[in-house]
Amino acid sequence: MSNGKLILLRHGQSQWNSTNQFTGWVDVDLTEKGEAEAKRGGELIKEKGLHPEVLYTSLLRRAIRTADIALNAADRLWIPVIRDWRLNERHYGALQGLNKADTKEKYGNEKFMAWRRSYDTRPPELEDGAEYSQSDDPRYANLDSVPKTECLKDVVARFVPYFKEEILPRAQKGQTVLIAAHGNSLRALVKHLDNISDDDIAGLNIPTGIPLVYEIAEDGSVVNPGGTYLDPEAAAAGAAAVANQGSK
């Protein structure tokens, strides 16, 4: 049996990516650039001869629309789709909606980077009923409680068990699975796949719209540690741009 494949695709540029705002669970849409990135991601998938058989994505439109655009470009729009909140972006708490550069200037680089990139430091909580709260959002009505803030450790705790139970078995059977998600939900997954330490994960940045492919053996092990970007040059530039967020 041939190896299975996981295609990790971070959503294309969102409206708040373009304005350098913390987004989290706020349901902003793609920009025109983001739509173009999603289309190019799908074209790369097709050009490399990859054939996704199922899609997993979040409940946020920037990931859902990225997946639709990419699958259309790859001629795979017909495949089954599973949407689950556990693939959502990290909840940024009271930082949601704030400009990153202004936040860094106000609180200092050390606190800014701890909130943004440390493994287990949560930003301040977002109060229920606040402007960017999801406490009354109908898509989360079945949750016992909606997060008020999260660190990356929290994202690992909600996403990785779901991945092991629902997604990994498909890859172990040789399937090709597309996972269209977010910077931090994908960082959580890559941390697990590559066994990255809690300290080192701070240095990992996922670029928008560029597919990252992992080959998975029948026993669930990763055949190509670190994964393979379908456009390495663009991925390096994109990751550097993500790392530089917070600058004016």
UniProtKB/Swiss-Prot annotation:
GO function term, MF aspect, one: phosphoglycerate mutase activity
Family the UniProt entry places it in: Belongs to the phosphoglycerate mutase family. BPG-dependent PGAM subfamily.
Function: Catalyzes the interconversion of 2-phosphoglycerate and 3-phosphoglycerate.
Residues the record lists as binding substrate: 10-17, 23-24, 62, 89-92, 100, 116-117, 183-184
Protein name, entry field: 2,3-bisphosphoglycerate-dependent phosphoglycerate mutase
Keyword Isomerase listed: yes
Record GO biological process: gluconeogenesis; glycolytic process
Record's catalysed reaction(s): (2R)-2-phosphoglycerate = (2R)-3-phosphoglycerate
Keywords carried by this UniProt record: Gluconeogenesis, Glycolysis, Isomerase
Pathway connected to this protein: Carbohydrate degradation; glycolysis; pyruvate from D-glyceraldehyde 3-phosphate: step 3/5
Catalytic residue positions: H11 (tele-phosphohistidine intermediate), E89 (proton donor/acceptor)
Site entry: Transition state stabilizer: H182
The organism of origin for this protein: Corynebacterium kroppenstedtii (strain DSM 44385 / JCM 11950 / CIP 105744 / CCUG 35717)
Pfam families recorded: His_Phos_1
Organism phylogeny: Bacteria, Bacillati, Actinomycetota, Actinomycetes, Mycobacteriales
Signal peptide: none
Entries under PROSITE patterns matching the protein: PG_MUTASE
SUPFAM superfamilies registered for this protein in UniProt: Phosphoglycerate mutase-like
UniProt keyword annotation of Cell inner membrane present: no
Gene: gpmA
EC number of this enzyme: 5.4.2.11
